[in-house]
Each structure stands twice: as C-alpha cells, then as structure tokens.
Curated annotation (Swiss-Prot):
Propeptide part(s) removed at maturation, as residue ranges: 1-18
Keywords: Antibiotic, Antimicrobial, Bacteriocin, Disulfide bond, Secreted
Protein name: Bacteriocin piscicolin-126
Disulfide bridge positions per record: C27-C32
Gene: pisA
Family: Belongs to the bacteriocin class IIA/YGNGV family.
InterPro entries, sorted: Bacteriocin_IIa, Bacteriocin_IIa_CS, Bacteriocin_IIa_dom_sf
UniProt lineage: Bacteria, Bacillati, Bacillota, Bacilli, Lactobacillales
Length: 62
C-alpha cells in the first residue's frame, strides 16, 4: 500500500499541473509525454470509426 500525504489548502494552491488532451498526450511546463497504453487504444478506435464512416467520424466531419 502506498503512503499518501493529505495536502493543506496552502499546499494545494502552490500545486501546478499540466493539461491532458484526452488522447494519451499530456503536457506541463517541462514538455509533453505520451501514455502509449491509452494512445494505442484511442488510435485504434479512431481508425475504426473513420473506416466505417468513410472518414467522417468525430472531429473529421467536414
């Protein structure tokens, strides 16, 4: 079991985070990283959706 520390309000206010883009990519002030276990599944889902819709799935409706 992992030991965790409860942060105070002041400590929480000092915490800075990054941005998660929902596709396995997350970025912070130090750069970006890819969680390939998530990205590969998302790439597969997007490819299947585009294949079955003739390329008109999701973000690519135009």
């Amino acid at each position: 079991m992992k030991t965790v520390k409860e942060l105070s309000v002041k400590e929480m206010q000092l915490t800075t985070g990054g941005k998660y883009y929902g596709n396995g990519v997350s970025c912070n002030k130090n750069g970006c990283t890819v969680d390939w276990s998530k990205a590969i599944g998302i790439i597969g889902n997007n490819a299947a959706a585009n294949l079955t819709t003739g390329g008109a799935a999701g973000w690519n409706k135009g």
